[in-house]
Amino acid sequence: LIHQLSGLLKSDSGTIHFDGNEISQLSAPKRCDAGMVRSYQITSIFRDFSVLDNVAMSIQAREGHSFRFWRNADNDRSLSNKAMKVLNETNLQDKAGVLADNLAHGEQRQLEVAMALATSPKMLLLDEPMAGMGPEESSRVTQFLNSMKGSYTMLLIEHDMDAVFALADRITVLVYGKAIACGKPEEIRNNSEVRNAYLGDG
């Protein structure tokens, strides 16, 4: 689903509308330019660069700079200030100088979200952000994403049902690619078909 929304996979039928416009024929980069930004199930960060520089590169990409000529945030006060603003927003300010590869898995997911937010998205598509996490780490990332809800529109694909019910205002449940239910969290929680498929009551 996220592949189709983000333009990486062409739909067989139907249309996709975003921000009042029909975007079904737009390429993935054009959809990104329109404000639809995604994270991936497998963490996608620059592991050999600092947390600050990861966010700085996203800012430069948003501003149209080539990565061949990217500027080091430590040598550019304006760029560093912009990147630090994003890190403060995502509670990563204390990790600014840490290599991305040295972060805990949950912190790497936070960094990936920070990189997405640095592009000033209108909608953030999150593809299984809790993938590979234990309960404690998943809970921390859920709290982090919950703190973002008031500022950003997010569409979340996730199999961690605790995270789904903690984060979502509206839930659509897919089974083998078919939508079997759509509604508010309590409506979904009480849906017998959903309970049989996902909540362990079948």
Language-model regions, residue ranges each:
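Glycine-rich phosphate-binding loops of nucleotide-dependent enzymes
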Residues: L1-G202
